[in-house]
A protein has these predicted regions:
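N-terminal assembly/interaction segments in proteins that build large macromolecular machines
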Residues: 2-199
Length: 199
């Protein structure tokens, strides 16, 4: 079956594949757009699997405060170009929505399956490298900060009765933590020997 330039365009828009790949797929599938899209997806997933061991040193943090919890999700990729891609950012926000609505506290299969289509269309290795949930207990205030690089972030939870004052202080602590990368992030983690050295 013959296919037209409009068919190639429709397949490109549906799959994100290149023009030549779309033409080859349509030729292999006798002009059937649905079959060609399936073929391109299969080929794309196979190619994505080959990229799976490539380093993902770039990426973006997604942090949100919902109720008495602060949710953190880290989505990594190979290049900063992709980390700033609108589809990549939208996917991270959608993953955070799913994390919150389903009560996930760690990386789940659903997170990884949500990545598949974007891996195929963008052609980079990507990973959900972190999902964390920080509880904000009653009487405490939580705050967070994401630096302009979108990869560095911090969360601080502080007990206190003056909500406005504590919130400002917690946010200031977040800024300080992001800037100076402290050795310890919780009072209980600090060894007695280190405390003694500081006196």
């Amino acid at each position: 079956m013959a296919f037209t330039a409009a068919d190639v365009k429709a397949l490109r828009e549906a799959t994100g594949a290149g023009m030549l790949e779309c033409k080859k797929a349509l030729t292999e599938c006798d002009g059937n757009i649905n079959d060609a899209a399936k073929l391109l997806k299969e080929k794309g997933l196979a190619a994505a699997a080959k990229r799976a061991d490539r380093a993902t040193a770039e990426g973006r943090l997604f942090i949100r405060n919902e109720g008495n919890k602060i949710y953190v999700l880290e989505l990594t990729c190979e290049t900063d170009f992709v980390a700033n891609n609108s589809d990549f950012i939208a996917l991270g926000e959608k993953m955070l929505d799913v994390t919150i609505s389903k009560g996930y506290t760690k990386v789940e299969d659903e997170h990884n399956s949500m990545l598949e289509d974007l891996k195929v269309s963008i052609r980079e290795n990507m990973n959900v490298s972190k999902v964390e949930v920080i509880d904000v207990p009653a009487g405490a205030i939580g705050s967070f900060y994401i630096h302009s690089d979108n990869k560095t972030g911090s969360v601080v939870v502080i007990n206190g009765s003056d909500a406005d004052l504590v919130k400002t202080f917690a946010y200031d602590c977040c800024l300080h933590i992001a800037a100076f990368t402290p050795s310890y992030t919780s009072k209980k983690d600090v060894p007695e020997s280190y405390i003694a050295e500081q006196k």
